[in-house]
Amino acid sequence: MHNIESRIQDLKEAAGKLSIKIEVANLNDQEFAIQSGYCKLNGEDLIILDKNLPDEEHVLVILNTLKKFNLDDIYVADWIRERIDTDKTAGAQS
């Protein structure tokens, strides 16, 4: 079992291969409500993570974003591919 820091590093590497930028920010200090998640900003793919959330939540946000992209042509850690495949299978059954 990987520790949470190595899982986050694996996810950041996968996102980087897809040219997805990841920013961690204090979202409580914003003038308007922002939640962690994926967006496009000036044509660039971006994941914004609230620094006040636990690392486990960061993992989920990045994983949910990676599910939207084609990962067939890039290397991603086995656990990421397994998790995404498991989630897709579970979603197809419901």
Language-model segments: what does each one mean?
Residues V59-L60:
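Active-site alpha-helix of zinc metalloproteases
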Residues L63-D87:
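C-terminal structural segments of small proteins and small subunits
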Residues H2, T86-S94:
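Short acidic DE-rich linear segments
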Residues L27, Q35-E56:
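Active-site scaffold of zinc-dependent metalloenzymes
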Residues M1-I34:
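Auxiliary, metal-adjacent structural segments of Zn-dependent hydrolase domains
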Residues N52-E56, A77-E82, G91:
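Short C-terminal domain-edge/linker segments immediately following a structured domain
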Residues N3-S6, L53, L71-Y75:
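Short coil/turn linker and secondary-structure boundary residues
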